[in-house]
């Protein structure tokens, strides 16, 4: 069953922007391991709070990504940029929806010009 992994990250003092850049970079690499999508959220009320969300069809693909060389290097390189422990949660996707975005329609003036 397809799953969504949620990984909460909390940056240490003055490291939020650096952690954001690295989370964006390493999240994009997840598709090499079979991820079907990813999102990185940053809190508006708390700019040090991040949520990395990755979707995989197979839990084993997630395990390969998390233990792979890129994520290992990320955790070594960014050591001290985030609070530990980092505890992720695998969730089964049971329902999904998405709004269809349409281009706005501009009405013509009543006189036709």
Where are these regions (language model features)?
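Short S/T/G/P-rich N-terminal loop/turn motif that feeds into the first structured element of a domain
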Residues: 1-72, 83-113
């Amino acid at each position: 069953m397809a799953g969504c992994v949620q990984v909460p990250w909390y940056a240490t003092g003055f490291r939020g922007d650096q952690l954001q850049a690295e989370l964006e970079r390493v999240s994009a690499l997840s598709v090499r391991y079979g991820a079907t999508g990813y999102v990185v959220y940053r809190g508006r009320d708390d700019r040090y709070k991040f949520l990395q969300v990755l979707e995989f069809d197979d839990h084993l693909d997630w395990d390969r990504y998390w233990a792979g060389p890129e994520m290992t290097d990320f955790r070594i390189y960014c050591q001290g940029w985030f609070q530990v422990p980092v505890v992720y949660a695998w969730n089964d996707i049971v329902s999904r929806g998405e709004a269809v975005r349409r281009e706005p329609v501009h009405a013509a003036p009543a006189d036709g010009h």
